Amino acid sequence: MSNSPLANYTLISPNKNSPRNHKIDTITIHCFVAQVTAKRGCEVFQPTSKKASCNYVVGYDGSIGLCVDEGDRSWCTSSGVNDHRAITIEVASDNKEPYAVTEKAYAAMLDLVTDICKRNGIKKLVWSTNKNERMNHLNGCNMTVHRDYANKS
């Protein structure tokens, strides 16, 4: 299993399970709730006391950081089942609703998701407005968000 060549910064978090126990078939995107660089975002997930991580951080400037190898499960969504099958991406955002992201962050996130899907054989991303369909991967749904599993944005 490979990591994205688009990552221009790597700082591996100790907060993970190695290896993941499920084929990658899902993308989970979450807002970081701070306009951080990828480097700063990865640094946040270093303390073991944090008990959280993600596979990638996308910075406000379009930088991409690798926090947890794709072969490993991040601790991102409060659901081990989801995290074992998903690549989890934290995207720098404003710290209040509507949690806006910069154009550079949005473009980098789209490039990263495209790369992840190509490398992992995900032919199509399917979003549902129905939480049950997202959480249970019904009707082809293979996109989830943190708020599906915890009281988050």
Residue spans for each PLM region:
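Short C-terminal domain-edge/linker segments immediately following a structured domain
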Residues: 58-63, 86-88, 118-123
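Basic/polar, cationic surfaces and motifs that engage anionic cell-wall
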Residues: 1-11, 16-21, 95-153
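N-terminal catalytic cores of peptidoglycan-degrading enzymes
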Residues: 1-83
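Structural preference for beta-strand elements that scaffold enzyme active sites
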Residues: 26, 86-88, 142-144
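Cell-envelope and extracellular/periplasmic
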Residues: 33, 70, 82-98, 114-118, ...
